[in-house]
Amino acid sequence: MAQVINTNSLSLLTQNNLNKSQSSLSSAIERLSSGLRINSAKDDAAGQAIANRFTSNIKGLTQASRNANDGISIAQTTEGALNEINNNLQRVRELSVQATNGTNSDSDLKSIQDEIQQRLEEIDRVSNQTQFNGVKVLSQDNQMKIQVGANDGETITIDLQKIDVKSLGLDGFNVNGPKEATVGDLKSSFKNVTGYDTYAVGANKYRVDVNSGAVVTDTTAPTVPDKVYVNAANGQLTTADAQNNTAVDLFKSTKSAAGTDDAKAIATSIKGGKVGDTFDYKGVSFTIDTKAGDDGNGTVSTTINGEKVTLTISDIGASATDVNSAKIQSSKDVYTSVVSGQFTFADKTKNESAKLSDLEANNAVKGESKITVNGAEYTANAAGDKVTLAGKTMFIDKTASGVSTLINEDAAAAKKSTANPLASIDSALSKVDAVRSSLGAIQNRFDSAITNLGNTVTNLNSARSRIEDADYATEVSNMSKAQILQQAGTSVLAQANQVPQNVLSLLR
């Protein structure tokens, strides 16, 4: 080996090795201080890329787990509100069962309906005001997507349904609505009515003109004979009240001589008098209302038992001989109204005036009834249990003050009692139960998703750790090795730097 001064090859070699050990020592110290095997891409380019993807997944899945927990919170909030709605529906059902009992009075039904209305309003309030983080969960149909994964499309959908009184089919729910009007309702509700009722007793049929109370036997008088009229201008049509078996007497129940009353006296009074004149007949004062002519035809009236009674004498549609057999009959009294003016009573032992109540009290069968009010014609069916106007059923409604009023089918539609109220509530409860079940199932699904996300995050962290984290046993060993090499290299470098000194000995 040549002895040179300018170039110290041993020193250069030693310096190079010392630099290597210095780099190794620096890397080991960096890893030990950071805990990471990969502190920059130069440490492991491929490993750094893989670990970074793992980091993205881990962060995304961690947030997804939090999202799933939010989904559980939304479902719990919604389910809690539905539980309150369910409680209100249960109370409404309880009240409806109470309302269907026939022992309730009108005031009872009103009180029940008032509480039902409050409960229904509370359902709407809960629906409109329940929200989660500003999102109303029951006020409208909504599909809420919850991101439960680190990538696009990894979602779970919560179906939020609108739950309020209308969507539950309880809009207008009523247990105290208007009831179908009957003839009796018309009798107690109307003023200034016109029309007629027909009744049958045995083989005989009778027609009572509502506007006048005239009684005509249809079977024996094909044409209209002279009639006895009972005024019904006050609207109280009690002359045809089959349920209560009450009616206004045509005349006071007074005896008549030999079973025959002479109505010619009335005809004569009409013939000889003028409108407004009064005269007495059987102790009753009559007033001439109308006078058709000098033949005795006309109308007179009086007040009996508080009711205005009108007697009309005429020969409409028949001569005196044609209608002598026209009869008005009940099981108790029989009399005949004829143009000749004879009122003949078949029951000679009683000789009482016929009363419309007799028709009612002896099982008269109601036929079809037609009543006109302010130009509108109402029709009652044969049983008298339904009243219609122009083909639509009429209803009786009670105002807040308890006054009964007649309303038509259209007006009653919004107020009428709910058909099958218990079935309606059961349907609403079923819908609420279905939504609650769905929310319960979605909560369980979120729980499962959270568990799976946790497992995935754990495994990804482990995988990333194996790539990215520093192995302290290895790194400490590397550091110790590098430190020893540094010490040895430094010592050897000192020796290598002394080699050129040997050349000086040659110069002595």
UniProtKB/Swiss-Prot annotation:
The keyword Secreted applies. InterPro entries: Flagellin, Flagellin_C, Flagellin_C_sub2, Flagellin_N. GO terms for molecular function: structural molecule activity. It is found in: Secreted; Bacterial flagellum. Keywords: Bacterial flagellum, Secreted. It comes from the Bacteria. The keyword Secreted applies. One of its GO terms (cellular component) is bacterial-type flagellum. Pfam families: Flagellin_C (PF00700), Flagellin_N (PF00669), FliC-like_3rd (PF22370). Its main location: secreted. Flagellin is the subunit protein which polymerizes to form the filaments of bacterial flagella. Belongs to the bacterial flagellin family. Individual Salmonella serotypes usually alternate between the production of 2 antigenic forms of flagella, termed phase 1 and phase 2, each specified by separate structural genes. This is Flagellin. It comes from Salmonella oranienberg. The gene is fliC.
